[in-house]
Amino acid sequence: MEFRGDANQRIARISAHLTPQMEAKNSVIGRENCRAKGGNPGFKVAILGAAGGIGQSLSLLMKMNPLVSLLHLYDVVNAPGVTADVSHMDTGAVVRGFLGAKQLEDALTGMDLVIIPAGIPRKPGMTRDDLFKINAGIVKTLCEGVAKCCPNAIVNLISNPVNSTVPIAAEVFKKAGTYDPKKLLGVTTLDVARANTFVAEVLGLDPREVDVPVVGGHAGVTILPLLSQVKPPSSFTPQEIEYLTNRIQNGGTEVVEAKAGAGSATLSMAYAAAKFADACLRGLRGDANVVECSFVASQVTELAFFATKVRLGRTGAEEVYQLGPLNEYERIGLEKAKDELAGSIQKGVEFIRK
Ligand SMILES: NC(=O)C1=CN([C@@H]2O[C@H](COP(=O)(O)OP(=O)(O)OC[C@H]3O[C@@H](n4cnc5c(N)ncnc54)[C@H](O)[C@@H]3O)[C@@H](O)[C@H]2O)C=CC1
Ligand SMILES: O=C([O-])CC(=O)C(=O)O
């Protein structure tokens, strides 16, 4: 009988949390009184924009990451549904959902890593810069929340245009007095994933064996694959270089056009974001030699931000690597990339300083 009593109490507790009344009473969407806390030692991760195309798949992938103990899913719509769904996966991370601006602070408090895929995606005919008008304000608001509630968190910024949203985030953090350049990382991992895939196709290799550094930024000509530095060392014909560079630079547009109005890359992007977040968490844990490309504050060129390989450690991007030797084709590409990047960075900075 004692056992039955305990079990009944447990069931009553759980059922109570399933009622809409209780959900409404709770400031967060979760199961606060349940015993099952996962109990994993690990990191606390928030996804802002978790109900979107990228956000949903990314939530699934982060729920599967053994380094995550607590996963906060925030969005202005549909966060409860995504949270309920993902929370039934029998992996270690405990999942809590947060809906709307009033719950942003709860979503962010105590987080080690904040991943931001919030904002509108492109439709055919648009550039990433066409998203600035709407996404700049979204990123500003969310980063103000980060500065207030988890100023020491690592931020992985996905929302486009990354070439401008990263400078916007930096300015927000500077204004709040919390800016640590090592902790603000623009996510360019999808460019590397595409480059590895397309180069592997040309070379007839497994993409997992290929490593292509992609530097610069995350839009059109600012995406600069360094094919002269591909591992394993490989040579390409001028036609192959032209084909690969164009395909990598226009990979996002290829998906936007194929989706024909239904958005941009979400599945490959969630994969890339999960890979990059995992690298950040391994760095936070103290693993050695965690190296990824990312758009960060940089002294590699005269620009304030630039994507190169960075070494991720306990405090974020602890080392920003130089470009290494470039061939003539890449030197010309670098000048074009810098010209466009300069304007995009300036636009982001001015959005906050105006
Ligand atoms: N860095 C990269 O390599 C890539 C970046 N992106 C960018 O990621 C962003 C998201 O793309 P999708 O997931 O496809 O778009 P989506 O429209 O499917 O999802 C965006 C989500 O953000 C949410 N949202 C809007 N305002 C918000 C706010 N203030 N706070 C929290 N959430 C908010 C929406 O409710 C929606 O659930 C776009 O800007 C897109 O261009 C997309 C692919 C690659
Ligand atoms: O192209 C877009 O709009 C989305 C994006 O950044 C990408 O897929 O690389």
Curated annotation (Swiss-Prot):
Residues engaged in binding substrate: R122, R128, N160, R194
Gene Ontology biological process terms in this record: glyoxylate cycle; malate metabolic process; regulation of fatty acid beta-oxidation; regulation of photorespiration; tricarboxylic acid cycle
Localization per record: Peroxisome
Annotated catalytic residues: H218 (proton acceptor)
One Pfam family matching this protein: Ldh_1_C
InterPro entries referenced in this protein's UniProt entry, alphabetically: L-lactate/malate_DH (IPR001557), Lactate/malate_DH_C (IPR022383), Lactate/malate_DH_N (IPR001236), Lactate_DH/Glyco_Ohase_4_C (IPR015955), Malate_DH_AS (IPR001252), Malate_DH_type1 (IPR010097), NAD(P)-bd_dom_sf (IPR036291)
Gene Ontology CC terms: peroxisome
EC number: 1.1.1.37
Binding site for NAD(+): G49, A50, A51, G52, G53, I54, G55, D75, N135, I158, S159, N160, M269
Gene3D superfamilies found in the cross-reference section: Lactate dehydrogenase/glycoside hydrolase, family 4, C-terminal (3.90.110.10), NAD(P)-binding Rossmann-like Domain (3.40.50.720)
Catalytic activity: (S)-malate + NAD(+) = oxaloacetate + NADH + H(+)
Phenotype of null mutants: No visible phenotype under normal growth conditions, but the double mutant plants pmdh1 and pmdh2 show seedling growth arrest 5 days after seed imbibition.
Annotated stretches, region: Peroxisomal targeting signal PTS2: 10-18
Tissue-wise expression: Expressed in rosette leaves.
Record keywords: Glyoxylate bypass, NAD, Oxidoreductase, Peroxisome, Tricarboxylic acid cycle
GO molecular function: L-malate dehydrogenase (NAD+) activity
Similarity remark: Belongs to the LDH/MDH superfamily. MDH type 1 family.
Function: Catalyzes a reversible NAD-dependent dehydrogenase reaction involved in central metabolism and redox homeostasis between organelle compartments. Peroxisomal NAD-dependent malate dehydrogenase involved in fatty acid beta-oxidation. Reoxidizes NADH from the beta-oxidation and provides NAD for the conversion of fatty acyl-CoA to acetyl-CoA. Does not participate directly in the glyoxylate cycle. Required for maintenance of photosynthetic rates under photorespiratory conditions, and carbon flow during photorespiration.
Annotated NCBIfam families: MDH_euk_gproteo (TIGR01772)
Assembly and oligomerization: Homodimer.
Name by which UniProt lists this protein: Malate dehydrogenase 2, peroxisomal
Upper classification of the organism: Eukaryota, Viridiplantae, Streptophyta, Embryophyta, Tracheophyta
Gene it is expressed from: PMDH2
